Amino acid sequence: MAKRWYVVHAYSGYEKHVMRSLIERVKLAGMEEEFGEILVPTEEVVEMRNGQKRKSERKFFPGYVLVQMEMNEGTWHLVKDTPRVMGFIGGTADKPAPITDREADAILRRVADSGDKPKPKTLFEPGETVRVIDGPFADFNGVVEEVNYEKSRIQVAVLIFGRSTPVELEFSQVEKV
């Protein structure tokens, strides 16, 4: 039987703990043959904290762990009896349904792509109001006109002397209002 990807519902905030517990339990039970990868899909994000750029991880699916496994009575019980696991997502309680290969590939591709360049933690949309927190236009409010995620820059229309003036800023220089 081929290994398929299943989504396991874990306590929110304990996804990494559940992942480590599952890996350990699989080894202790000698079931490495029935299990493949066990992972918490995350991406690296950059945020500003106290004027410093900090890298952190953001989970794609908070509260969920992806498990590649052959579904049988033994593997089902091993996962279900792991502390802080609430159960499987999809199918029925005693016969969980795997996610499609296309869904699994999309998630794995997204995880692989996220390692290339960290994304900003805050996403900006054209038309939304932001406050400039750094630079010559600090404390001005403006409307987002364009967002360039490759360069981590944002074009904001700031009202100066009663006229709308486009200003190009870095993500770290603005915050959502």
Curated annotation (Swiss-Prot):
Give the Gene3D superfamilies listed for this entry.
2.30.30.30, NusG, N-terminal domain
GO CC: one term? Answer: cytosol
- Report the residue ranges that make up the KOW domain in this protein: 126-156
Which superkingdom?
Bacteria
Q: Which InterPro entries match?
A: KOW, NGN, NGN-like_dom, NGN_dom_sf, NusG-like, Rib_uL2_dom2, Transcrpt_antiterm_NusG, Transcrpt_antiterm_NusG_bac_CS
* One GO process term, biological-process aspect: transcription elongation-coupled chromatin remodeling
UniProt keyword annotations, A-Z:
Transcription, Transcription antitermination, Transcription regulation, Transcription termination
Say what the protein does: Participates in transcription elongation, termination and antitermination.
Q: Which PANTHER family match?
A: RHO-INTERACTING TRANSCRIPTION TERMINATION FACTOR NUSG, TRANSCRIPTION TERMINATION_ANTITERMINATION PROTEIN NUSG
The protein's name? Transcription termination/antitermination protein NusG
Q: Which organism is it from?
A: Pseudomonas aeruginosa (strain ATCC 15692 / DSM 22644 / CIP 104116 / JCM 14847 / LMG 12228 / 1C / PRS 101 / PAO1)
